[in-house]
Amino acid sequence: MNKSELKKKLTPEQYRVTQEKGTEAPFSGKFVNHHEKGMYTCIVCGRPLFPSNTKFDSGTGWPSFDKAIPGAVSQVPDTAHGMNRTEITCSNCGAHLGHVFDDGLIDTEKRFCTNSCSLDFTPD
């Protein structure tokens, strides 16, 4: 999809986050306190990213997952804003999803910290 098509498909906030690597305000997203069973998908291309059983409450204000579907998420070094982080993007379309940190649950020690507006949801 080109920029014009994306701007028609996405809300201004979804575009800012997924295409310009923005971050939504903590505790503002619709999936922060979302607990339905199903699949979280990329808002841009629809690729399945995170099963609902991998979601946990990290207390950070953003939807957090301890693992992604294998091959669904790419990890990219991010040194913006003077920080050393790892950006996560949709491996299909390159949409910015958030960041992954090594402070998650005991099983994986990963916290995929995502922006709600970069996600969609398909219930089981």
Locations of the language-model features?
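A short Gly-Trp-Pro
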Residues: 1-124
